[in-house]
Amino acid sequence: MNYEQNAREQAEQLRAAGHATILAIESSCDETAAAIVRDGRQVISSVISSQIPLHAMYGGVVPEIASRAHVESVDPVVDETLKKADMRLEDVDAVAVTYGPGLVGALLIGVSAAKALAYAANKPLVPVNHIEGHVSANYVSHPDLEPPFVCLVASGGHSHIVRVDDYGVYTLLGQTMDDAAGEAFDKAARVLGLPYPGGPLLDKLSREGNPHALKLPHVQTPGRYDYSFSGLKTALINTVHKLRQNGQDVPAADIAASFQHAAVELLSDKAMLAAVETGAKTVALAGGVASNSGLRNTMNDKCQKAGIRLVMPPPILCTDNAAMIGSAAFYRLMRGEIAGLDLNACPSLKLV
């Protein structure tokens, strides 16, 4: 029996049993991460190797540097993950990996490592969509959570509102028409002279400012639940440049607070509109921007007023990690969705 026949047979056995312990790998951008997750909810071990110091001097992620760092980190990260769990590779039931979307070079490192591990251990290989991983982080932090629910996914590369109809089944309700929310936050931070990564620093600075100091536009979009952040970003840039050209001080805290307030209101208004109009009883947050304190507080207030349950992962599970990939992989495995050794990176992969 060859590898792929054996993997399919094992996957069917795991599906019938309804249980699986999965080694997951995440390398879509600038974190090399691995985790061991049991039954999609219980994290046995999780390790994240961040590349922030490598990219800080460039003000953003440099794809070539990211790929090289993944090559250096992936084996040690996997080894440490197994060690923390007091397990050997042979003890896991399957290997999972993010295969898109993301930086193609970075994705290829994780995919190659996962294929090698799956083949060496003769285990099924489970391909996972990175965005689905972010959604699934909520299953780890809230073990009682079950579909259906509405999820706002906001990160550096993506801004979606999706209805989670079932495990792995999604309906796209809205999306950004231009910039992603995290991209807009990072650009605003750079304009204010904040170092990389700027989003968390802008969040911190905004707490010292007046959120109503600057009137920023709320751009209308053709889609009822769609987003547009380009006008908001441009208005901020023009305001700062005008102040500097006139020799005036740039009140960084007030500008940060005003930008964050406008962005958070846009994100939360659309998400709540989608939730109310679709009759959702639960709203989830996901993605790196979900760690923003303003968004978390605002969504909490609005959900309480609407009588809707809000779930959101802790910040460590909002940013890229492999625990979320292991969670998503479990439900894919339970549907019999595995990959062969011809699995390739898909940098433009869509969720739906």
Where in the sequence are the language-model features?
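A contiguous, well-structured pocket-lining segment that forms one wall/lid of small-molecule binding clefts
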Residues: 204-283, 293-306, 333-336
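Conserved phosphate-binding catalytic cores of ATP/NTP-utilizing and phosphoryl-transfer enzymes
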Residues: 5-20, 128-150, 328
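Glycine-rich phosphate-binding loop plus the immediately following alpha-helix
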Residues: 143, 166-208, 233-234, 238-242
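Short Gly/Thr/Asp-enriched flexible loops that form oxyanion-binding sites at enzyme active sites
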Residues: 97-123, 140, 293-302
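Conserved phosphate-binding/catalytic loops in two-lobed NTP-binding clefts
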Residues: 127-128, 299-324
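Glycine-rich phosphate-binding/hydrolytic loop that grips phosphoryl groups
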Residues: 313-351
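Short beta-strand scaffold segments in enzyme catalytic cores
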Residues: 32-38, 151-153, 159-163
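N-terminal beta-alpha supersecondary unit
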Residues: 17-91, 97-101, 130, 134, ...
